């Protein structure tokens, strides 16, 4: 059998053992809890003095401080240059987390290695010291097991009934002398020969502190058992929890304590309540404190400290890849901690809905209580659905949570007025104020799938909330008010109404300030950039008047875009110095992220696809643009006789083509307006990706016109200078629809010949939408569906047959793409673009 196979079999056996043990513990615990009267448990809890609870929670939070001595010994032994206050804070955070998800202390050991490696160059010595701390956590129990064997702590009622427990205590007790001997023979260095002894003593005090918290929990619920007996039961229960490999010993520890106290004649209801208080005081309270400390201890300052550490610099090249992720994780700890606190707050106050209903049932002012219940529930729901927003440091989410806390605070004062909970709300509110001031993101981009998920989650949470309230009241056999005479039957809809009102108010407050950003009245700088660095096929549309401009900080490049529907839709590629494009996009994406806007690029070329890809985008091919090589274009030859026939027909009708330079007279504008109105036939102008018929736009470039023999304009096209690849393009092409003449062909042919005569090398005929898009069976279904929507719901222009029409000019086809974020929906992004194009 190979070594690899042995290790694999050993891992499987460990997993099977842990799983079987866990199932057995759960089954036994379920059997024991099935006989418990939960009504009596709740009644016993309601009779507990609240100040006793506060004292217990303080003891639980303080007990974790003893574990900081591990880190103090470590820092002093290795002579690490860390302020003591920082050591205590980091240690408290590590130990609180380790208590919940410790897996035998490995989580805590990993965090210690992660934090302290930046303060030493001798990583081997650090790992050795941490391993001693890890093992010594068990040695404390070994020392206490010796005291149980010596009957200093009394567990005889368990040992006498279950004989194999005695042998487990003997075996565990033997670990201590072996560990002490090993650490003294193989110390980390000469100066730390007694490190194992010191850590064992710390471990012993820590286990005794935890046992004391359990004893105080039993005292509070009126269990009269001697201190030494409770400690003895605790030690055996702690050993059971360690053997189970379950984080925190959940299940195994509780089962042993339950059976141990039950064998002494203690009612199960009291034991359950004592265990719940112990778990809350020794595990939950320290985690809360650790989360609060994390919001201050980690972040930009800690990140900067690690980056500037003299021990980190030499290893930067070696570990830069891993460290790049580690420092990002450290920076996110404060927001994660605050989001967790908000989540806990939401759950706690959802549970307190039971108290409001209970008080309302016995109060004469039922309506006031149930209105408060709706407000309270709405606020709790807003806390829950904004947890992710708080983690993402969204100001809007933080503002939602702050408003929700104000409502919960008001409802709490009116109803059950718990001083502990009111203090908790104030603490979280202060943390949120600090987070709001640090936040640089106004809101997160809107996502339809996120909205659907939020609605489903909200409905589910409200249903579960109602179910828990009704089942709790039923289980407690509490008097019920008739639903027909109570406002309680409208509770669900009142909650929805309050949520909608709150969301609407906050959305309006934030949204009204950021609707048309970066409007630019003076386009002279844009014109200068185009003349200096060149433009593209769409750069002339800067003069259409329906776009905003995002300018590069050094004014070397810019973007044309439009704000619509919580999105910034950019037209084409950036314009200007290509060397400035990356920094321009970084600034633009930072700006969009700050305000919570989606960023979509429309009709971009494939020149800068790698650049767009770097920003986490994906692509959809919109179609292909027809580019005619004017150096090869001709009307001569057999294949071009159709072109010659068209031109000859216009000559026979004495229809003339002419290029006019601006400025244009009022009379000409009036004639062009008449042609445009008849061509539109009551339809609205399109926007954004094409120009509109406005005098300001027409005055920016030459216009090609076709006149009949009376000199009346019957067709026209507006030129689009590109300052790019010696190319020319046209924008508006309009003619009198009543005339049975191929006027569009005539305009194109005359423009092609004119452009060739003027020395241009390329002519852009525009895009054939969905050309070669979603045509194969292997194409993404969503792309084919989105392409059909984009094609059939764009009513002004007909794209069917457009490629076939342009093919007769023998163009070269260049692809054009839609660029959108990878976490955004394709069809929803295209709908946003359509809104921009179809609405001014």
Curated annotation (Swiss-Prot):
Spans traversing the lipid bilayer: 9-29, 53-73, 90-110, 130-150, 168-188, 194-216, 230-250, 272-292, 336-356, 367-387, 395-415, 416-436, 451-471, 491-511
Please give the residue ranges for the topological domain Extracellular. Answer: 30-52, 111-129, 189-193, 251-271, 357-366, 472-490
Q: Would you say which domain of life the source belongs to?
A: Bacteria
Q: Name one GO molecular function term.
A: phosphatidylglycerol lysyltransferase activity
Q: Which Pfam families match?
A: LPG_synthase_C, LPG_synthase_TM
Keywords (A to Z) from UniProt: Antibiotic resistance, Cell membrane, Lipid metabolism, Membrane, Transferase, Transmembrane, Transmembrane helix, Virulence
* Protein name as catalogued: Phosphatidylglycerol lysyltransferase
In which organism is this protein found? Staphylococcus haemolyticus (strain JCSC1435)
Q: What is the lineage of its organism?
A: Bacteria, Bacillati, Bacillota, Bacilli, Bacillales
């Amino acid at each position: 059998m190979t070594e690899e196979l042995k290790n694999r079999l050993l891992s499987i056996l460990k997993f099977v053992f842990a799983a079987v043990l866990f199932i057995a513990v759960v089954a036994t615990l379920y059997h024991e809890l099935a006989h418990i009267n939960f009504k009596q448990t709740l009644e016993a809890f309601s009779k507990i003095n609240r100040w006793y609870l506060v004292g217990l929670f303080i003891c639980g939070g303080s007990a974790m401080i003893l574990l900081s001595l591990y880190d103090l010994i470590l820092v002093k032994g290795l002579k690490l240059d860390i302020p003591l206050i920082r050591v205590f804070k980091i240690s408290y955070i590590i130990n609180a987390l380790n208590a919940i998800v410790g897996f035998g202390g490995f989580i805590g050991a990993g965090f210690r290695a992660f934090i302290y490696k930046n303060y030493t160059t001798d990583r081997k010595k650090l790992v050795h010291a941490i391993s001693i701390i890890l093992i010594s956590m068990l040695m404390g129990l070994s020392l206490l097991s010796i005291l149980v064997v010596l009957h200093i702590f009394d567990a005889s009622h368990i040992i006498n009934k279950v004989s194999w427990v005695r042998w487990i205590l003997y075996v565990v007790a033997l670990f201590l002398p072996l560990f002490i001997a090993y650490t003294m023979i193989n110390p980390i260095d000469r100066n730390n020969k007694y490190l194992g002894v010191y850590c064992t003593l710390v471990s012993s005090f820590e286990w005794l502190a935890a046992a004391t918290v359990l004893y105080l929990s039993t005292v509070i619920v009126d269990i009269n058992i001697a201190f030494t007996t409770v400690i003895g039961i605790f030690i055996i229960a702690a050993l059971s929890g360690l053997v189970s490999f379950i984080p925190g010993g959940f299940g195994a520890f509780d089962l042993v304590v339950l059976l141990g106290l039950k064998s002494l004649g203690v009612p199960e209801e009291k034991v359950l309540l004592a265990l719940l208080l112990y778990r809350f005081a020794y595990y939950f309270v320290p985690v809360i404190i650790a989360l609060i400390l994390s919001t201050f201890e980690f972040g930009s300052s800690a990140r900067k400290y690690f980056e500037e550490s003299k021990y980190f610099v030499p290893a930067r090249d070696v570990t830069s890849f891993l460290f790049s992720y580690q420092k990002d994780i450290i920076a996110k700890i404060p927001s994660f901690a605050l989001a967790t606190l908000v989540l806990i707050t939401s759950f706690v106050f959802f549970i307190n809905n039971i108290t409001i209903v209970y008080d309302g049932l016995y109060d004469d002012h039922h309506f006031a209580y149930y209105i408060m219940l709706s407000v309270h529930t709405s606020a709790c729901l807003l806390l829950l659905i904004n947890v992710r927003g708080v983690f993402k440091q969204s100001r809007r989410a933080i503002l939602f949570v702050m408003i929700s806390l104000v409502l919960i605070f008001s409802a709490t004062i009116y109803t059950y007025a718990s001083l502990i909970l009111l203090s908790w709300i104030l603490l979280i509110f202060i943390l949120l104020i600090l987070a709001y001031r640090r936040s640089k993101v106004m809101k997160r981009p809107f996502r339809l799938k996120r909205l659907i998920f939020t609605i489903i989650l909200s409905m589910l949470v409200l249903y579960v909330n109602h179910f828990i309230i009704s089942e709790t009241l039923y289980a407690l056999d509490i008097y019920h008010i008739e639903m027909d005479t109570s406002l309680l039957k409208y509770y669900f809809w009142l909650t929805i109404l309050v949520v909608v009102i709150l969301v609407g108010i906050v959305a309006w407050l934030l949204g009204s300030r950021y609707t048309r950003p970066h409007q630019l009245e003076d386009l002279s700088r844009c014109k200068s950039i185009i003349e200096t660095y060149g433009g593209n096929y769409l750069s002339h549309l800067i003069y259409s008047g329906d776009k905003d401009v995002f300018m590069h900080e050094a004014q070397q490049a810019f973007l044309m875009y439009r704000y619509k529907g919580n999105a910034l839709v950019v037209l084409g590629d950036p314009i200007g110095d290509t060397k400035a494009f990356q920094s321009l996009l970084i600034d633009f994406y930072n700006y969009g992220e700050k305000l919570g806007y989606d960023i979509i690029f429309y009709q971009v070329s494939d020149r800068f696809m790698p650049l767009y890809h770097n920003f986490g985008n994906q692509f959809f091919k919109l179609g292909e643009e027809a580019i005619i090589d004017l150096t090869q274009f001709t009307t001569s030859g057999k294949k071009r006789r159709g072109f010659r026939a068209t031109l000859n027909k216009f000559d026979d009708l004495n229809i003339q083509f002419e290029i006019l330079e601006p400025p244009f007279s009022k009379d000409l504008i009036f004639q062009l307006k008449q042609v445009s109105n008849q061509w539109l036939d009551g339809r609205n102008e399109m926007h954004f990706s094409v120009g509109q018929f406005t005098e300001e736009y027409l005055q920016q470039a030459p216009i090609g016109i076709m006149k009949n023999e009376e000199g009346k304009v019957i067709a026209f096209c507006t030129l689009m200078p590109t300052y790019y690849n010696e190319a020319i393009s046209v924008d508006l092409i309009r003619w009198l629809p009543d005339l049975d003449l191929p006027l569009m062909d005539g305009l194109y042919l005359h423009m092609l010949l004119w452009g060739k005569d003027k020395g241009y090398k390329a002519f852009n005929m525009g895009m054939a939408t969905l050309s070669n898009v979603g045509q194969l069976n292997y194409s993404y279904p969503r792309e084919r569906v989105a392409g059909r929507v984009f094609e059939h719901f764009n009513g002004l222009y007909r794209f069917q047959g457009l490629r076939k029409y342009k093919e007769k000019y023998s163009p070269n086809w260049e692809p054009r793409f839609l660029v959108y974020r990878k976490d955004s929906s394709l069809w929803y992004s295209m709908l946003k673009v359509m809104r921009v194009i179809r609405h001014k």
